[in-house]
Amino acid sequence: MLFFSFYKSLVGKEITVELKNDLSITGLLQSVDQFLNIKLKDIKVNEEDKYPYMISVKNCFIRGSVVRYVHLPAEDVDVETLQDHSRLEAREQKKQNKQHQEQTNQKSSNTTTTTTV
């Protein structure tokens, strides 16, 4: 959820999305969802001569699984806050994993196996 929250803070900013098929699209971030699907408006394709069919497109929806990179303006990225939140999320994940492991161990110790000969 870290990146989802981070991208939500960038709504309204201009970003460049590079797709796995080498298409790069620049536009204003309109919305992003938990799957990191992205909606851009007022888009511009970086290599219009290579993708002439994209010239007339003004808005687009990009499925998160086809994104290779997202280029962000440096002034909009607060590295310290991002590092703090990633550490916090890692700690919470570690805590959840430990609790899950303890529950699994308790369940396995409570079950007994009987064999008949």
UniProtKB/Swiss-Prot annotation:
Residues 102-117 have a biased composition (Low complexity). Residues 83-117 are annotated as: Disordered. PROSITE patterns: SM (PS52002). GO terms for cellular component: catalytic step 2 spliceosome; Lsm1-7-Pat1 complex; nucleolus; P-body; precatalytic spliceosome; U4/U6 x U5 tri-snRNP complex; U6 snRNP. Its main location: nucleus. Keywords: mRNA processing, mRNA splicing, Nucleus, Ribonucleoprotein, RNA-binding, Spliceosome. It is found in: Nucleus. CDD domains: LSm2. Gene3D superfamilies: 2.30.30.100. Transmembrane segments: none annotated. Residues 83-101 have a biased composition (Basic and acidic residues). The keyword Zinc-finger does not apply. It holds the Pfam family LSM. GO terms for molecular function: RNA binding. Residues 2-76 form the Sm domain. One of its GO terms (biological process) is mRNA splicing, via spliceosome. The keyword Signal does not apply. InterPro entries: LSM_dom_sf (IPR010920), Sm (IPR047575), Sm_dom_euk/arc (IPR001163), U6_snRNA_Lsm2 (IPR016654). Component of the precatalytic spliceosome (spliceosome B complex). Component of the U4/U6-U5 tri-snRNP complex, a building block of the precatalytic spliceosome (spliceosome B complex). LSM2, LSM3, LSM4, LSM5, LSM6, LSM7 and LSM8 form a heptameric, ring-shaped subcomplex (the LSM2-8 complex) that is part of the U4/U6-U5 tri-snRNP complex and the precatalytic spliceosome. Plays a role in pre-mRNA splicing as component of the U4/U6-U5 tri-snRNP complex that is involved in spliceosome assembly, and as component of the precatalytic spliceosome (spliceosome B complex). The heptameric LSM2-8 complex binds specifically to the 3'-terminal U-tract of U6 snRNA. Belongs to the snRNP Sm proteins family. This is Probable U6 snRNA-associated Sm-like protein LSm2. It comes from Dictyostelium discoideum (Social amoeba). The gene is lsm2.
